Amino acid sequence: MKRLLLVSFLAFSVHSLADDTTFDWSGLERSKISLEAPLLIVKGSLGFLGCGYINTDSCIDEACAIVSGVNTHDDMLKASVKAVSKDATKLGIKVGMTGVEAMELLR
């Protein structure tokens, strides 16, 4: 049983590391403002993915998707989208999709 748990943990760890190192950040601008919890944004040509500091109601004529509980840009990729602006909805971004899925539509 212990061996099975160890193998499962190692497989998950390797898979997680692979996800972080394989994302193509080209064409995207990453910004971070260091606060008690960081303010994070990843900007693509069609809009941006932001952390919980951003309110979609203030994203007038902007396609933005919001993820929360993140501390790094890599965390943003794995997190679930919690809110979307009207313009982001027009691009096909939906609450519940991953940050990676949203970024590919905002790229």
Model segments located where?
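Positively charged n-region of N-terminal signal peptides that target proteins for export
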Residues: 1-4
